[in-house]
Design a protein with these regions (language model features):
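Periplasmic c-type cytochrome electron-transfer domains
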Residues: 21-344
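Positively charged n-region of N-terminal signal peptides that target proteins for export
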Residues: 1-5
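Bacterial N-terminal signal peptides
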Residues: 7-17
Length: 344
């Protein structure tokens, strides 16, 4: 009798262990990608090299799977955002940001070149790192509906060479999709490649942008139009709550009120502006930089101007010229490309 009970117990343990191995995020197992199709992105030569992890190479099948997951409400099943997909908020026509008033959401564009994510840099590393946070902590993805779906098991097998569907697998597929979200075909790019020319006003605006007159280029560096760093740009002189920015992560006084530099690519489409969405138009943003910067002990030194303090003092015409240039950063192809839209 005891032998039978012991045998049954051992069998149960083996069964539970097998199920755990099957369903856990088995990151140590190397997937079979021999049947996938490598995908090389068409990125201009003046862009930095893409950092693509060896264990999550870009493939046609992986990007297609990530795209489908991005647009599928099944991803939020049983989670805090039940019934919503990533794309329910991140609108392609708005450069994959969230339209509306209130807190601004950084757009899902050119994140393949980023190593710090979210306004305060709460997550650092690769796209896999930020999407692991999104999958596990934000969406709290339940993978059972994906495992029981009539199509997803085959899609995961084709894309990732795995017979399991885990949160780790979902993360990898989404990371490939996010690397596909590259905006590199604006008028600014066409001018840089000799395929177009600026109007006189756009050229004047570019001169302001890339000189000390506008002082934009120090943080919004070309070609990504962001340095992917953190700066206190003088939105306010006292800080509390979310407004402490990077300080909440590092505890360093120099980071008080500092937030990640957003890319200016497609900036004309991504209102409202600043981390808290306080500005509704580019005109308001330029007015702030021209004469509304507030001093604080952690104000970034790049915000000070010799002889003029913390104001740019742009004329109305200079402001208009600068805004004209900012509009050349709009990539109409990116925001209208059917290949980036819903697959459903």
């Amino acid at each position: 009798m005891r032998a039978s009970v012991a045998a049954a117990f051992i069998t149960l343990v083996m069964l539970v262990t097998t199920m755990a191995c099957r369903h856990d995020d088995l990151e140590g197992i190397q997937p079979d990608l021999s049947r996938t199709t490598p995908l090389e992105l068409d990125v201009p030569s003046y862009f930095p090299p893409l950092n693509i992890p060896a264990d999550d190479p870009l493939t046609v099948e992986g990007v297609a799977l990530g795209r489908r997951l991005y647009y599928d409400t099944l991803l939020s099943h049983n989670g805090p955002f039940q019934g919503r997909a990533c794309a329910s908020c991140h609108d392609q026509s708005r450069s994959f940001t969230v339209p509306g008033n209130g807190t601004n959401v950084l757009p899902h564009v050119n994140l393949a070149w980023s190593t710090n994510f979210l306004w305060n840099g709460k997550v650092s590393g690769t796209l896999e790192d930020i999407l692991r946070f999104e999958v596990e902590d934000f969406f709290q993805v339940d993978v059972e509906p994906l495992r029981n779906h009539p199509e997803y098991p085959a899609l995961f097998r084709q894309a990732l060479g795995t017979n399991t569907i885990t949160r780790h697998d979902v993360t990898r597929a989404l990371a490939q999709w996010f690397r596909r979200l590259t905006s590199t075909r604006s008028k600014f790019d066409q001018v840089k490649m000799g395929q177009a020319v600026f109007t006189v006003q756009e050229q004047l605006g570019a001169m302001i942008f890339f000189s000390e007159a506008g002082d934009c280029f120090h943080c919004h560096t070309s070609p990504l139009m962001t340095d992917n760093a953190f700066h206190n740009i003088g939105l306010q002189s006292a800080f509390s709550g979310y407004d402490v920015g990077r300080y909440a992560i590092t505890g360093a006084p120099m980071h008080m009120g500092a937030f990640k530099t957003p890319t200016l690519r497609n900036i004309a489409l991504t209102a409202p502006y600043m981390h808290d969405g306080r500005f509704q138009s580019l005109e308001e943003v330029i007015d702030f930089y021209s004469g509304g910067v507030q001093h604080s002990p952690s104000l970034d030194p790049i915000m000070t101007k010799p002889g003029t303090g913390i104001t740019l003092g742009l004329t109305s015409q200079q402001k208009a010229d600068l805004i004209a240039f900012l509009h050349t950063l709009t990539d109409e192809t990116f925001v209208t490309d059917p290949a980036l839209g819903s697959p459903f």
